[in-house]
């Protein structure tokens, strides 16, 4: 928390009400972590669990209970807490390898070791060694993304162990200095600077949610709306006294997308390369199929043939536009607790025909899912390959800078582009407004059996959301065609 932003720690101690509650998306991430943790702990049979919960008495008594388990001679201990002066940590696993000597394991539901894992383990190592334990080796237990489910989950194949002892040891002195700084911040009655320039560990988006709630920005095109923003740029602009994108001086170092955004904002008009867009549209072959998937993923693959976190389509929408202007709609939504792949692919090959351009938004996503479906169901591999050969990315004019509007805020996302150009229809009126919610709600309802009294309504909401994605593409295509005609 402190390493993400010093003021985050200060707020946690002095003004918790300023911190946002855990939302559904973040809770889903926590749930994934807990699910993997339950499997990973099976790698340590006969372990003694101290146990952690947010109940005050449970947390308060953890150090005493942990010491009792250590003194009992337990070889492996799960979910313990130790204190050393003013600092404390909860560890996932320690394994006794000698007299007061232990290996330390951190369980993470990511598919690789990350910088914050090393720093977290360095902090734990400092606490454990100050508390009288010697740490021999340090490991991260993480998800093996090469794992493919076949029958029951084999934990030894699902989880990978990566030793990080040297990386952790290299961070110990840095960590000790940061601990002293953190304690000074925590004890101070005054907060540190709240500026996003002080963000670390790639936590800018997380901190901006807190910062903008505390300090609402009056100008819609303030510097915090610059695309690909990072803390260094924030600091440099603040030092120059720049508060809005239009004030960014000539010669300020920006990438190409940032520069396009700044240019469009200063000009206060759309920049349209009609020739490039006209050439792009001329290559389309009717009928046109506007196509979009909705997918789910899970850290523990629920079906055979799936990898951890593999994006599996459970829904699609297709709007077909004929050359005479006739528009028709096809859709699919899997509502059973079973692998949606085969029923989806069977209907898809019927609905999307064999000829005509297939238009998507961000082609690598749909193409990737089609390749995976072809691998999972080899009898359809050729049809998926042919489908991918027909795909064209309707995002290209916006991502390539052929059509730029300052109100896109440097983004080519359909959620940014569509409301600026087409005002008659809005995602705001839908109960499900973005793909993350669609994925989470489908998984909870149709895979995990929750929301049983709302199944029909949720299915209706999912169909409405996915249907609007492809209708939005139709309308954006029509807009572009009119713009360059």
Region spans (language model):
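Conserved RNase H-like, two-metal-ion catalytic cores of nucleic-acid enzymes
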Residues: 82, 276-354, 375
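Short, amphipathic alpha-helical segments that act as regulatory/interfacial helices
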Residues: 41, 125, 371-374, 474-481
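Structured core elements
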Residues: 104, 290, 315-317, 359-360, ...
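Acidic, Mg2+-coordinating catalytic module of metal-dependent nucleases/exonucleases
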Residues: 153-222, 234, 417-485
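Conserved DEDDh/DEDDy metal-dependent 3′-5′ exonuclease domain
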Residues: 74-80, 84, 88-92, 104-107, ...
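Metal-dependent nuclease catalytic cores that hydrolyze phosphodiester bonds in DNA/RNA
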Residues: 1-100, 232-257
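Residues forming anionic-ligand binding surfaces in small-molecule and nucleic-acid pockets
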Residues: 97-109
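N-terminal accessory regions of nucleic-acid-interacting proteins
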Residues: 222-288
């Amino acid at each position: 928390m402190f390493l993400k932003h010093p003021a985050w720690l200060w707020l946690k101690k002095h003004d918790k009400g300023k911190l946002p509650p855990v939302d559904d998306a973040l809770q889903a991430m926590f749930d994934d972590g807990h699910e993997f943790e339950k499997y990973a702990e099976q790698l340590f049979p006969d372990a003694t669990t101290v146990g952690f919960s947010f109940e005050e008495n449970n947390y308060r008594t953890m150090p005493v209970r942990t010491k009792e388990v250590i003194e009992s001679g337990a070889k492996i201990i799960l979910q313990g807490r130790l204190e050393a002066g003013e600092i404390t940590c909860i560890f996932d696993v320690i394994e006794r390898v000698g007299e007061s000597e232990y290996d330390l394991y951190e369980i993470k539901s990511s598919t690789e070791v990350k910088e914050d894992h090393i720093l977290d383990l360095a902090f734990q190592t400092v606490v454990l060694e100050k508390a009288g334990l010697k740490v021999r080796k340090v490991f991260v237990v993480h998800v093996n993304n090469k794992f493919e489910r076949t029958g029951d989950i084999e934990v030894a194949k699902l989880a990978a162990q990566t030793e990080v002892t040297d990386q952790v040891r290299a961070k110990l002195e840095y960590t000790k200095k940061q601990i002293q700084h953190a304690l000074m911040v925590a004890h101070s009655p005054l907060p540190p600077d709240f500026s996003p320039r002080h963000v670390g560990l790639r936590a800018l988006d997380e901190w901006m949610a807190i910062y903008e709630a505390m300090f609402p920005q009056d100008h819609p095109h303030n510097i915090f709306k610059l695309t690909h923003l990072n803390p260094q740029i924030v600091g440099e602009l603040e030092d120059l006294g720049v508060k809005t994108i239009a004030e960014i001086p000539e010669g300020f170092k920006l990438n190409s997308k940032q520069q396009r955004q700044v240019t469009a904002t200063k000009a206060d008009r759309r920049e349209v390369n009609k020739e490039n867009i006209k050439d792009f549209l001329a290559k389309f072959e009717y009928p046109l199929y506007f196509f979009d998937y909705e997918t789910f993923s899970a850290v523990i693959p629920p079906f055979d043939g799936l990898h951890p976190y593999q994006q599996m389509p459970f829904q699609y929408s297709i709007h077909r536009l004929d050359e005479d202007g006739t528009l028709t709609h096809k859709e699919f939504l899997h509502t059973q607790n079973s692998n949606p792949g085969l029923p989806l692919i069977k209907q898809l090959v019927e609905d999307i025909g064999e000829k005509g351009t297939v238009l998507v938004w961000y082609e690598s996503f749909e193409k990737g899912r089609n390749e995976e479906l072809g691998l999972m169901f080899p009898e359809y591999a050729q049809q998926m390959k042919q489908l991918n050969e027909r795909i064209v990315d309707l995002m290209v004019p916006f991502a390539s800078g052929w059509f730029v509007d300052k109100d896109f805020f440097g983004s080519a996302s359909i959620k940014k582009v569509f409301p600026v150009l087409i005002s008659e229809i809005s995602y705001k009126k839908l109960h499900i407004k973005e793909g993350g919610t669609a994925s989470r709600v489908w998984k909870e309802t149709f895979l995990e059996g929750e929301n049983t009294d709302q199944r029909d309504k949720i299915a209706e909401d999912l169909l409405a959301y996915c249907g609007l994605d492809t209708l939005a593409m139709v309308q954006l295509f029509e807009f572009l065609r009119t713009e360059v005609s």
